[in-house]
């Protein structure tokens, strides 16, 4: 997809599963099972982790990073993740890009399926997957992710983002703001507190 000077592509960083009832809420299983997926023996449904790659001029940025591959064997089994396929690096290769080519990442929020690919584990160390990238997240959301409620604690893995903060790579935004000319963020409350929606516009066509 092209929006003025911006070229927007979808990255495929793998599939994972979550409980179908949690995903569809008050919608009866009889309806979502027929329309989407019947669920496996544990009532889990497949979901895709698909960040966006945005390119213009000499800039290359991502919106979210997918799951990553830091999962323990136990968590990989719970979420049905094939760690050999859940890779941001492999997804970037499809566009002839390397991790060091990425200039910035706008994080809609810090749930593991959106920020997990931002870091990787080498031995006992957590290091950035994208060594030259600056990361952007809402200030209120970062505070929430550091001290989540019992309800959504399981969706935040601090190895995904705390090392970015410690290394000075994670920049917080307080409310609406333009990150690059034509690319801005708008805070929203969705399935977690203080997420941000990304707006890409050339002055005529707009993508949210």
Where are these regions (language model features)?
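Conserved G/P- and acidic residue-centered "switch" motifs that form tight phosphate/ATP-binding loops
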Residues: 64, 109, 191
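A short secondary-structure junction signal
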Residues: 73-74, 117-119, 146-150, 197-198
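Metal-dependent catalytic neighborhoods of phosphoester/phosphodiester hydrolases
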Residues: 115-125
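Conserved beta-strand hairpin/beta-sheet module of binuclear metal-dependent hydrolase folds
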Residues: 2-7, 12-94, 197-208
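Short active-site segment of divalent metal-dependent hydrolases/proteases
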Residues: 67, 112, 194
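Short, P/G- and charge-enriched loop/turn segments at secondary-structure junctions
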Residues: 37-42, 123-124, 185
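Metallo-beta-lactamase
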Residues: 83-97, 101-113, 129-187, 192
């Amino acid at each position: 997809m092209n929006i003025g000077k911006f070229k927007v592509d979808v990255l495929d960083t793998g599939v994972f599963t979550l409980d179908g009832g949690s995903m569809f809420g008050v919608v009866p299983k009889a309806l979502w099972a027929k329309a989407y997926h019947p669920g496996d023996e544990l009532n889990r449904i497949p979901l895709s982790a698909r960040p966006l790659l945005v390119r213009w001029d000499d800039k290359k940025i991502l919106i979210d990073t997918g799951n990553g591959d830091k999962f323990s064997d136990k968590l990989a089994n719970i979420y049905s993740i094939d760690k050999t396929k859940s890779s941001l690096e492999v997804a970037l290769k499809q566009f002839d890009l390397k991790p060091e080519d990425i200039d910035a990442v706008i994080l809609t929020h810090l749930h593991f399926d959106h920020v997990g690919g931002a870091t990787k584990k080498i031995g006992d160390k957590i290091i950035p997957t994208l060594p030259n990238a600056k990361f952007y997240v809402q200030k209120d959301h970062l505070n929430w992710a550091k001290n989540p409620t019992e309800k959504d604690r399981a969706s935040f893995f601090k190895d995904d983002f705390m090392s970015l903060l410690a290394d000075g790579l994670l920049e917080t935004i307080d409310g609406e703001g333009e990150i690059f000319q034509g690319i801005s963020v708008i805070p929203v409350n969705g399935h977690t507190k203080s997420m941000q929606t990304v707006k890409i516009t050339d002055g005529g066509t707009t993508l949210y």
